[in-house]
Regions:
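Non-catalytic C-terminal accessory region of glycerolipid acyltransferases
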Residues: 11-143
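Catalytic core of membrane glycerolipid acyltransferases/transacylases, capturing the structured
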Residues: 1-8
Length: 143
């Protein structure tokens, strides 16, 4: 886990991920910025995961986790056990890409995930966002 408020922690995690990749292992990185805000469907992405992929010329496999906001919300009183639906998409190949290409690759990955979340037939994320709005209204009734 990374302490996002600490540059030392962020750099340490980045270094460990680089080491694992150098040793031939795969890594799973959740690149979302400020993920603790339950009112946002999908935040913009940080660059680190994409920089690592391009640096090592490795493909990126975007994945949508449909039920996270409902099953594992950050306002822990309302979490519950259960299964998560996960969808993986076609890889984004980085062979021949350079650091200057990071913003484009970042946005392609984010859009694939965002489009999947907004077209979920079970509307799990939308339901979770509405639940969160209700929690906030009960907490701050004058808002």
């Amino acid at each position: 886990m990374v302490d996002r408020s600490s540059s030392k922690s962020r750099y340490g995690v980045y270094g460990r991920a680089r080491k694992e990749l150098n040793n031939g292992y795969s890594v799973c990185i959740f690149p979302e910025k400020d993920y603790l805000d339950e009112s946002v469907l999908l935040n913009p992405f940080k660059q680190g995961a994409f920089k690592l992929a391009i640096e090592h010329q490795l493909p990126i496999l975007p994945m949508a986790f449909y039920d996270c906001k409902r099953k594992m919300p950050w306002y822990t009183y309302y979490g519950r056990p259960g299964s998560l639906r996960v969808e993986s998409f076609e890889p984004i190949y980085t062979l021949g890409l350079e650091e200057k290409d990071i913003p484009v690759v970042q946005e392609i990955a984010r859009q694939k995930i965002y489009n999947a979340l907004t077209s979920d037939p079970k509307k799990a994320t939308e339901k979770a966002l509405k639940l969160w709005e209700g929690v906030m209204q009960r907490q701050n009734p004058s808002s």
